[in-house]
């Protein structure tokens, strides 16, 4: 079995670099808030009316999840970010890159395993 622990994907906002992690907690929060399966993640960027709000929520959630993981792993205290902070660092020049980085973080956070699920696929 390979390493199932999600790894942080780096993103730069302003002068600061942050990690983003898709943990089970983050996936659960996303599915609950948007009432979608995680496989439908790209749908959150399709509606021009909600795209920005969804992007800010996802980015803050994933950055804060990485901050919490770093604290668990190292004890380092790093302040959380909020959606307003994230929104100040997203513009038309970097929005597409940020969306792609979020999707890459999802891919990086998905465990790679050579084993099949013992009870078939789960929802």
Question: Which positions does each model-derived feature cover?
Answer:
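Short, hydrophobic/amphipathic alpha-helical patches that form generic packing surfaces
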Residues: 54-65, 100-104
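Short, surface-exposed, low-complexity cationic segments
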Residues: 24-41
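Short capping micro-motif at the N-terminus of alpha-helices
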Residues: 20-22
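Charged interaction scaffolds used for protein-protein
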Residues: 1-13, 17, 36-49, 71-123
């Amino acid at each position: 079995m390979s390493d199932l622990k999600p790894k942080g994907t780096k993103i730069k906002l302003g002068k600061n670099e942050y990690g983003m992690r898709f943990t089970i907690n983050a996936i659960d929060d996303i599915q609950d808030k948007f009432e979608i399966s995680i496989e439908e993640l790209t749908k959150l960027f399709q509606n021009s009316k909600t795209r920005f709000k969804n992007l800010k929520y996802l980015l803050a959630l994933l950055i804060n999840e990485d901050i919490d993981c770093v604290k668990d792993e190292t004890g380092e205290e790093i302040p959380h970010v909020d959606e307003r902070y994230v929104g100040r660092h997203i513009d038309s020049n970097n929005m597409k890159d940020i969306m792609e980085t979020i999707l890459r973080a999802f891919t990086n956070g998905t465990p790679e395993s050579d084993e099949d699920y013992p009870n078939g696929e789960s929802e």
